[in-house]
Amino acid sequence: MKEVRKTSENVLLLDAGNTLFGNRPLAKQTQGQAIVEAMNLMGYDAMVLGSEDFRLGLDVLRQRMEEAEFPILSANVVISGTDQLFATPYVIKEIADHKVAIIGLTNQEAASAAGGDIVALDPLETLRDLMDEVSEEADVVIVLSHLGAEANFQLPSQAQGIDLIVGGYSRDVLRPPLWNEASGTVIAQAGYQGQRIGIVSLEMDSQGKVAGHEGEVVVLTDEFADDPEMRAFLDQYK
């Protein structure tokens, strides 16, 4: 990411969920705290909560959200028995004089993962309800969707005005990203467990609208040297 940021100032680093809870030692050992610290070091701009993240429990998850130096989103998760959202539904970022909305959607398995402490509302209905509000505030709309590829293919026809969907939950790799010609929506997904990184470049026209895109999926092999700062951070957990 440091190399990418050297060549472009207009970069968003996003995560599509199931990142804080997992079977890997670092996540289990620290209940996701080290993951958040690493994401802070990398300069993440936003992530969406995945269903597995709720296995940490709400109290621990709230602590991780406080530690994060970036917004952790979910527009469709509410505390059981209330209409109170558990997380921020969306955030507006200003990138190169363009206002970019980033919305988070969590799959409905989150409710069982949290032991019934939360309810995951219908994500499509939630998105439709949000789009008018968000479209008035932003030039570009990105959805961080922890719903899986099949659901992501349906989103552009269910809610107009989405420019980019960054997908998680399913293990699909879309290489290159798909383009929904009818809606103009780009759909990107890069697999799971940090094995790959998806890169999408959006071209903006003079009206502040998306006029084109390019995308690729990069496999993170040993040819990429360790970042010294990140290596030093990880070494403290050995």
Residue ranges of model-derived segments:
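Acidic, metal/ion-coordinating pockets
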Residues: M1-K238
